[in-house]
UniProtKB/Swiss-Prot annotation:
Residues in Ig-like domain copies: 220-311, 321-416
Record text on subunit structure and interactions: Interacts with host complement component C3; this interaction inhibits host immune response by disregulating complement cascade.
Alphabetical keyword list: Disulfide bond, Glycoprotein, Host-virus interaction, Immunoglobulin domain, Inhibition of host complement factors by virus, Membrane, Repeat, Signal, Transmembrane, Transmembrane helix, Viral attachment to host adhesion receptor, Viral attachment to host cell, Viral immunoevasion, Virion, Virus entry into host cell
Family: Belongs to the herpesviridae glycoprotein C family.
Compartments where found: Virion membrane
Function description: Essential for the initial attachment to heparan sulfate moieties of the host cell surface proteoglycans. Also plays a role in host immune evasion by inhibiting the host complement cascade activation.
Key word Membrane present: yes
Stretches in topological domain Cytoplasmic: 452-468
UniProt keyword Disulfide bond present: yes
Major localization listed first in the record, in broad terms: virion
Annotated protein name in UniProt: Envelope glycoprotein C
Region annotation Disordered: where it falls in the sequence: 31-73
Gene this chain is encoded by: gC
Protein species of origin: Equine herpesvirus 1 (strain Ab4p) (EHV-1)
Disulfide cross-links: C76-C93, C239-C301, C340-C399, C344-C373
């Protein structure tokens, strides 16, 4: 009887132990799940990139290489460079793989471009630049052209493609090299543009490329000249915008007082470009006089210079024209002097200069103010005298009113006088001859009268003595 009871005891004990084990395992699992959150699992995709010949490499999103994978890239320190005109620029570009001549070919190109991709913000410039090259693509460097270099330190230059090869310092040819720096010695209109580093596989397939955009600028110099004018003539001024870059980067406007001047009616423009590529623009305004204006207006030249598409600077200069009354000048000969009379001249700042046969004489003149100009307030009349030349012959005596600003016509007058003795004695001789002829004529008249009177008396018979 004891054997069946033993079997029952063992079975019950087994069940109790099994239940305890399951309960413990369940509690441990629940405790673990509460104290440590489960970490979600992400699947990292593989990104396929451009490869060299015979490469099946891939790079995942975390930047780590998968088995048998490698990304081939070209990296430059800067992608946009903007510097002042004539400044040097260093561009440092590297490849992620060594450029072995048997596997790769690296080339550097220059795409000559203007800085404005769309419509230029400035005015159109009417000039012809015979020295400029059109927008084109130039090959500067190629690892496949190692034997065409002609100058030490200038390796890789493709001959006859650039006007001056010394514009650049090019990379050295190194088997398996990864560094391909390029230096522009002086940035100007020839060297501004987009520089492209391109890596090709042996079969000519483009592996990768990158670009660096280089732009340059030069701020303009603004000069305004307000021209003097005579009363009743147009107001004139000239604005010179010199040595600026880029092309079509200046917007110019004229203002009379605060009102903008009609560009098509009253403004003329001319532009020129120098061999260095800098532009100079000359703008001239000529505005008719408004008789209703009481005062002379102010003329202002204002420019907006765009260094690039997003930034600009405004520069302006203004001035008021000086208006003068044209004087009346006349020269005459009086009492052995040449006399110059100038009417309606400024009371200060002007004077008379003489010339004899276009030469300045050494004889001083005597200048004096003779009164005020009745038709123009603030102006005076003046007179200058100088002795006539004692030399024989014909002389031109010119009187010039000096002191007026440049831009006005010359105010002068000229008289011709001959001081030869024959010419000087001719009036006396003429007088003597006239008196003599007059006296002779008078004597002849008296004689004729006497003869006539004598002949008109009646004749009488002779008397005889016996008649007495």
């Amino acid at each position: 009887m004891w054997l069946p009871n033993l079997v029952r005891f063992v079975a019950v004990a087994y069940l109790i132990c099994a239940g305890a084990i399951l309960t413990y395992a369940s509690g441990a699992s629940a405790s673990s799940s509460q104290s440590t959150p489960a970490t979600p699992t992400h699947t990292t995709p593989n990104l396929t990139t451009a490869h060299g010949a015979g490469s099946d490499n891939t790079t995942n999103a975390n930047g780590t290489e998968s088995t048998h994978s490698h990304e081939t890239t070209i990296t430059c320190t800067k992608s946009l460079i903007s510097v002042p005109y004539y400044k040097s620029v260093d561009m440092n570009c590297t490849t992620s793989v060594g450029v072995n001549y048997s596997e790769y070919r690296l080339e550097i190109y220059l795409n000559q471009r203007t800085p404005f991709s769309g419509t230029p913000p400035g005015d159109e410039e009417n000039y012809i630049n015979h020295n400029a090259t059109k927008d084109q693509t130039l090959l500067l460097f190629s690892t496949a052209e190692r034997k065409k270099s002609r100058r030490g330190g200038q390796l890789g230059v493709i001959p006859d493609r650039l006007p001056k090869r010394q514009l650049f310092n090019l990379p050295l040819h190194t088997e398996g090299g990864t560094k391909f720096p390029l230096t522009i010695k002086s940035v100007d209109w020839r060297t501004a543009g987009i520089y492209v580093w391109s890596l090709y596989a042996k079969n000519g397939t483009l592996v990768n490329s990158t670009s660096v955009t280089v732009s340059t600028y030069n701020a303009p110099l603004l000069d305004l000249s307000v021209h003097p004018s005579l009363k009743g003539e147009n107001y004139r001024a000239t604005c010179v915008v010199a040595s600026y870059f880029p092309h079509s980067s200046v917007k110019l406007r004229w203002y009379k007082n605060a009102r903008e001047v009609d560009f098509t009616k009253y403004v003329t423009n001319a532009s020129s470009v120098w061999v260095d590529g800098l532009i100079t623009r000359i703008s001239t305004v000529s505005i008719p006089v408004d008789p209703e204006e009481e005062y002379t207006p102010s003329l202002r030249c204002s420019i907006d210079w765009y260094r690039d598409e997003v930034s600009f600077a405004r520069i302006a200069k203004a001035g008021t024209p000086s208006v003068f009354v044209a004087p009346t000048v006349s020269v005459s000969v009086e009492d052995g002097d040449a006399v110059c009379t100038a009417k309606c001249v400024p009371s200060t700042g002007v004077f008379v200069s003489w010339s004899v046969n276009d030469h300045l004489p050494g004889v001083p003149s005597q200048d004096m103010t003779t009164g005020v100009c009745p038709s123009h307030s603030g102006l005076v009349n003046m007179q200058s005298r100088r002795p006539l030349s004692e030399e024989n012959g014909e002389r031109e005596y010119s009187c010039i009113i000096e002191g007026y600003p440049d831009g006005l016509p010359m105010f002068s007058d000229t008289v011709v006088y001959d001081a030869s003795p024959i010419v000087e004695d001719r009036p006396v001789l003429t007088s003597i001859i006239a008196v003599t002829c007059g006296a002779a004529a008078l004597a002849l008249v008296v004689l004729i009268t006497a003869v006539c009177f004598y002949c008109s008396k009646p004749s009488q018979a002779p008397y005889k003595k016996s008649d007495f």
